[in-house]
């Protein structure tokens, strides 16, 4: 979607609706839906602080749960846990989140689990040295940009998350694409000559960030990396 928007020179799409109501989708039994909604909302208010803490840390609370159950995407899904996973677990993200109030993504959501980081100073790319607001990360971003690529530095995840949002790149897609390229590199399918001097090993933060910027600029190996895994497989197999 980001590529389509860029090519059409579209910055954003704004949708207007008359208003937000509980029966926007013309439910069959509105009273029953409202009753269940009241019950679910009450359970969330009473239990969330003691269990998932979604209102405090959002979906990032899943990091340690997935790691404990050997389900955390690690090194392009080769593993399900890692000894350094605590470096990017929910306690770490709680220390970064600065907006303590619930910040829902939709009007009326009682969970309001979206979080953000204020005044974060960017270190690379076109916004280097500037302080910005970074949305999230949610679990999918923390795991996709983090453990799946062998990255256990929260600051790398935050900066990559910011630039993906800024460039119009899906964090999940980029995390998976990068992990695929990293495994190809470590297995000898890719090398510095093919990547334009980048060493795409698991956990190599500087080169991973540089590749993301090259994708956004449409430069060198970034032109290939930005095409997604399906096309990359074809290119790597042929060449």
What are these regions (language model features)?
Residues 1-239:
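Intrinsically disordered, low-complexity segments enriched in small residues
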